[in-house]
Amino acid sequence: MIKAQKLVDSYPISFLLSLAFCLRIYNIQSPILGVHSWRQADTAAMARNFYENGYNFFYPQIDWGGNLAGYCQTEFPIYSFSVAILYKFFGVHESIGRLLSIIFSLIAIYFFYKLCLEITCDKKLAFWSSFFYTIIPTNIYYSRTFQPESLVLMSAISGTYFFYKWIKNDHKKYLFISSLLICLACLVKVVPAFYLFLPFTYLVWQKFKYKMFSNLNLYLYTAIIIIPTFAWYFHSYQVANEYRLSFGFSAEKLGWNFQGLGIMFEQIVYFIAVRHLLVVGFIIMIFGIFCRRENKEEIFFDMLFISNILYIIVFANIHSSHEYYQLFFLITASVYMGKVFTRNRYSTKIINVIIVVFLLTGSLFYSLEYMTKENPNNSELFELAQIIKQTVPKNSLIIATTGNDPTILYLSDRKGWIPSPNAINQTYLLDRFKDGAKYLVGGYNFVQAYQSSMEEKDKKKIREVVSRSSNSILNSENFFLIKL
């Protein structure tokens, strides 16, 4: 035990990165299933379409465009494009996308440790903060999924580190590197601009005071971030107008849903306190917020925390829908958790008990909530995808009743439409048949990957449609597949 502790003290980053890699590499070969498979399926589909249809970076393609080319308004597709390039050398394997996410997450952990150490000058705090950031179950999961979250976090954290280095050393190379990294983060997900503005402004004010308004380097820094970001999203908006396909960058997703305000914020608290921090971690974080600050530089993390809270409140609608929008919140949460273990006089025994409870709770939660749902042997959706692969010709367009969830299209390597079951009627089927649809497919026991059963009225209606068809290929207790 003593030797192990000395090893951790001597090589903290090596220990953290090794631990992070081991936690994330498990089940890397899993197909696109489970929690938020719909988001992963879109990202994976873009990568596969880049690989199969030519590397047209400015026009990413999805699978649910029906008889259209599938050009879609998306975030900056550098992640999918990078995976597609790797496909050229290694073939199409989901594990490549997952491995790329893991690599980005390891870089993020490295710079998170360096940032904590740079700001606090406390090696022990930097380690404990990074340790909790490494083992939080949701952070483990989303840093090995087939989506660009780990790229955004890596870019934002490393960009923040280099910005802080510039503040302290005044070397322009740090500012330039930071501008490129923050620009990349904003291109992929524009939200870093919201939660980094306040802490960056705090750092600049501490250094320059009113002279910040006449600092040309800061204007150039801002321009490097804003101009490419605006250019991409303007282009993406034009794609949406021309091809009528979008990931849903709309005003309806912003702000508040006043009719369900209580439920909305209750869901956000549930995401943060229960799913992210497992209650135990949330309590530790609350204690950490009130721990002393050793220097004024540490206020940076308080500014980042406040910025995150404001961002969550202002954009509460999207935060109540998807848990991965709070991933950046885990940075400050981890710092506060780390402070509890370094700035309070708790006995080693108490610390060990808390860590064991957190690890056991996290392991159980991660296994039951995430890993079991990635098991194809437990998935009717995956089973149906294999039936489609074997039954439906490769280039035939299908209608899948998965309610805007493209997972079935990706897993079956088919293209088509993904309406909700309640949209299915003879008029809809006739219109899609005229558009080139050849098959209607679906499952009676699931709609979206996150909706485990179809409503009885929709199930009854679809059974009637299937029973009237003279070209029914499959109509079992679980699945239906008919030729139109």
Model-based region annotation:
Residues A20-F21, S129-T134, I182, C186, ...:
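Short helix- or helix-capping micro-motifs
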Residues I25-Q29, D42-Y71, I78:
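Extracytosolic helix-loop segments that constitute the early lumenal/periplasmic catalytic or substrate-binding loops
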Residues D42-N53, L184, Y195-I299, N308-E323, ...:
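Transmembrane-lumen/periplasm boundary regions of multi-pass, lipid-linked membrane glycan transferases
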Residues I96-T120, S158-F162:
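Transmembrane-helix motifs of polytopic, lipid-linked glycan transferases
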Residues L117-K124, G159-L175, A185, F341:
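Membrane-interface transmembrane helices that cradle and orient dolichyl/undecaprenyl
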Residues Y141-L151:
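Short acidic/glycine- and proline-prone juxtamembrane loop motifs at membrane-interface regions
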Residues P192, V340-P376:
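Transmembrane alpha-helical segments
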Residues L196-F197, N378, K389-F433, A437-Q448:
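Short periplasmic/luminal acceptor-recognition loop of GT-C membrane glycosyltransferases, typified by
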